[in-house]
From Swiss-Prot:
Assigned keywords, A-Z: Cytoplasm, Methyltransferase, rRNA processing, S-adenosyl-L-methionine, Transferase
Reactions listed under catalytic activity: guanosine(1516) in 16S rRNA + S-adenosyl-L-methionine = N(2)-methylguanosine(1516) in 16S rRNA + S-adenosyl-L-homocysteine + H(+)
Name under which the protein is recorded: Ribosomal RNA small subunit methyltransferase J
InterPro entries: 16SrRNA_methylTrfase_J, SAM-dependent_MTases_sf
Enzyme class at the top of the EC tree: transferase
Organism: Histophilus somni (strain 2336) (Haemophilus somnus)
Length: 254
């Protein structure tokens, strides 16, 4: 069970709603925590942020599908040539349904959704779940991508894919990208990873995700790994797609 104690800070006038949201996810305010979930307002929009208070230079982690990096990736990224698109098997008119069982900040899921895949997301850590839920809420209301997002990206109110019924709630593809201990030299590359390591740590029970993923997947399970990582659950995939720093291991449904 992850530690759900975190400093809870409200910088808006919606303290009652923020408190209720945190209580719903079982978050406990810890005034001594260096990690803080913050409700703030930026350019007139209320959003949730994760901050590491003892390292303010890291900035905040939040989910934004409308502007910034994700908007640029949607408009000018590789599209169907993106590694994740190839890994899930997008080809011609075939757009698989996908369950992203370790959704995180929803970035890979967003790439697939923007290409037309129907993606259901599962995120078990309550703080990350709230960040993702908040980002989706703002995206659903956006004039440009709102309709697409509502149709193609759905965050499920469950903590683990084992809660899904494989016969009724499966998908063509189940996608896994569990947290993995970073090499020391790469630990500072991304602020999100540094803050996430403090919040979540490594996914020590990640191996237990593969079996339920294979049960839910109707065609394949895809596991994203750092290029130096072992196969998940020590299970050899049918084949892999290699990128500069990562590897997509593909397990076909037999």
């Amino acid at each position: 069970m992850v530690n759900q104690k975190i400093q809870l800070i409200c910088e808006t006038e919606s303290a009652v709603q923020f408190t209720a949201l945190c209580q719903q996810k079982g978050l406990i305010h810890d005034p001594n925590s260096y990690l803080a979930l913050v409700q703030t307002k930026v350019e007139g929009q209320v959003r949730l942020e994760l901050r590491k208070l003892d390292e303010p230079k890291l900035g905040a982690v939040y989910v934004d599908f409308v502007t910034g990096t994700m908007a640029h990736r949607r408009k000018f990224g590789g599209g169907r040539a993106e590694a994740v698109a190839k890994a899930v098997g997008i080809k011609g008119n075939y757009l698989p349904t996908v369950i992203d069982a370790t959704a995180g900040l929803g970035r890979d899921a967003f790439v697939l959704a923007a290409l037309g895949c129907k993606v259901r997301l599962v995120e078990r850590h309550p703080v990350v779940h709230l960040l993702l839920q908040d980002g989706l809420k703002r995206a659903y209301a956006d004039a440009e991508i709102g309709t697409m997002m509502q149709a193609n990206m759905q965050l499920l109110d469950i903590a683990h894919i084992q809660e899904l019924n494989s016969s009724e709630e499966g998908a063509d593809v189940v996608y896994l990208d569990p947290m993995y201990p970073h090499k020391q030299k790469s630990a500072l590359v991304k602020k999100e990873m540094r803050i996430f390591q403090h919040l979540i740590g490594a996914d020590l029970d990640a191996d237990m995700l593969l079996e339920p993923a294979l049960l839910l997947a109707q065609k394949r399970a895809v596991v994203k790994r750092p290029d130096y990582a072992d196969f998940l659950a020590k299970k050899t995939p049918h084949f892999s797609h290699q990128t500069k720093n990562h590897r997509f291991d593909i397990y076909l449904k037999t």
